[in-house]
């Protein structure tokens, strides 16, 4: 792929993604760089191509409607050895509630409780405090209950570009059934384990 942009613009994009520490929207990057949003996509592709060609330890990923600089997965063990992160795990109840929100959003607390068969107040507050879920409006129904949906941090947490990358519900149900038949308790696909 031929390079169309100057080294300065690619370097500027690299700097912005480095200092951001998380996903940055295409519109924000375009405004900072003084280019069109489509140019940001091209710049990111060029930068990623350079990283791949030079076998760097970093990559540029499309995440949550923008771009993020992150380490390549094959070097994760080195990063873990240095940082020894203690990521707070989500309980099974939190994962179940989060799955309901992700697949049915916007959804009310009452709808979540109906599906789960138990109260979700504590779990919902945990998901909100971790920035994975947010209020997204009010339902046009008596009492105007609050509607909840996922956040860009949810996409980042699960490494998704957008909600379309969620596995189809049929695949999730089949995975749960296969796990139970094999004697397991079932788990959410893409999750390393449970609490």
UniProtKB/Swiss-Prot annotation:
One of its GO terms (biological process) is cell division. Keywords: Cell cycle, Cell division, Chromosome partition, Cytoplasm. It is found in: Cytoplasm. GO terms for cellular component: cytoplasm. It holds the Pfam family SMC_ScpB. Residues 169-195 are annotated as: Disordered. The keyword Hydrolase does not apply. InterPro entries: ScpB_csome_segregation, WH-like_DNA-bd_sf, WH_DNA-bd_sf. Belongs to the ScpB family. Homodimer. Homodimerization may be required to stabilize the binding of ScpA to the Smc head domains. Component of a cohesin-like complex composed of ScpA, ScpB and the Smc homodimer, in which ScpA and ScpB bind to the head domain of Smc. The presence of the three proteins is required for the association of the complex with DNA. Participates in chromosomal partition during cell division. May act via the formation of a condensin-like complex containing Smc and ScpA that pull DNA away from mid-cell into both cell halves. This is Segregation and condensation protein B. It comes from Moorella thermoacetica (strain ATCC 39073 / JCM 9320).
